[in-house]
Amino acid sequence: MSQQDNGKLIATAVGAAAAGATLAVMAMKMMDKQGNNNNNATTNGYRRYPYYDDPIHRRDLPNVIMNDPSMLMTDPSERSGSIGHGQTGMTRSDSDNLLFPHNHEEKMRRRIATRYTIEEENILPRDSVTVRVPATSANVGPGYDCIGIAVDLWSEVTVSRAETFEITAEGEGAESMPKDDSNYLVVGCKAAFEAAGKPLPTLKYHVVSRIPYARGLGSSSAAIVAGIVAGLVLAGHRLPCWGSEALLQIAAGIEGHPDNVAPVIYGGIQLGIHNGTRWVTERVQSPPGLQMVMFIPDFVGKTSDARGVLPPTVTRADAAFNIGRAAFLVHAFATNNLDNLRWGVQDKLHQPQRGDKLYKYLYPMIEAAENAGACCAYLSGAGPTVMALTSGASGDIFAQREKERTDILVAKAMIQCAKDFGVDGKLLVTNVVSEGARVVKVVPPFSTGEITYRDNI
């Protein structure tokens, strides 16, 4: 078995274990809410809707488009309109799990049915668009290529129609970014126009980067998603009509795995797998008050180099070790059991190899962070950044005295460890962000477009 095939097999197994843990937590919460777990229970005349009552699985229902390839059709007549059940052809309103208030089911069915047949005629192609995208921290220990977290650290990208191609950048890693069409921002734009069935126009790109470049914080995934979103807007598509699932399929197809692009798009903590047909993600509840303390070395870490040190095969014992830890990790997040995070982030598939051959400071820094009070610490993405997760005495950093600020104590311990190993870098403290990519400015603005659908149902 090739190294690539083996990696995909392990990532699939780990992703399945993590997804299983999420479903188990969801089932427990549903039982608590429903008592006898009866989907047809009523409360004050309303039929219960257990699945979306649970915050772990609450997502933007109208933006979830599941059937591929109809999802990418530019002609509304070609779209199936099916959402939420993959290849089954069902709509969410046909599912036994979706129970609307009994007096309004027909109206909701009509809303869902019409949502995906909105004509896109007279939508203005845009001249310029600005998109904000968050950093991400992937793998999170055992979740190799399938678990990622959105970090409250944002880059801003402006893409405009122009007479000549140009890429300019300022901020983090500006001098290291490719200035040709190999830049992932351009790759994302090309993919968006191709999916829209339109030729790529001449564009200029300006990046205000606050995400450290090639440091294990998802700079490439952020660029891919920003490019896709910008491209769809410039091509004259309204994003709600395409849905965030369309963005996921395009972005993960470029990246090759969903652990970074999913949190860039959706925010929060995301699980992602490929089910054999398409990319699928689920959100995991983020514990309140969770802080992210990251040590970012000054040197660049290449993902290709970090993957190159991994062995082509793994033992059954190591695979079982990671599967168990991934399930434990997801359960700890979903139940706010921060004490279990330390065991949940343990890994045998990539961190030991990378720590031994690339990042000698990795395990000493993890130990220093945890000894200082961190819930856990791990290698962020392919490195070289080390990420620690902490929770203060009250969960609100503004209500704490400095001696209660666990994140400050952990930061000082990580800085001292870096000094001991002679590694220069910087320390940032931030938090998990619940939202993903967003359009912040469009020229001409969306409000100048014509209304293409209206109903009073």
Model regions: which residues?
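Short hydrophobic alpha-helical membrane-entry/anchor segments
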Residues: 2-11, 21-42
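A short glycine/serine-rich beta->alpha loop
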Residues: 2-4, 135-137, 170-179, 209-218, ...
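Stable alpha-helical structural segments in soluble proteins, enriched in small hydrophobic residues
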Residues: 22-26, 185, 192, 222, ...
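Gly/Ser-rich oxyanion-binding loop with an adjacent helix/lid
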Residues: 199-284
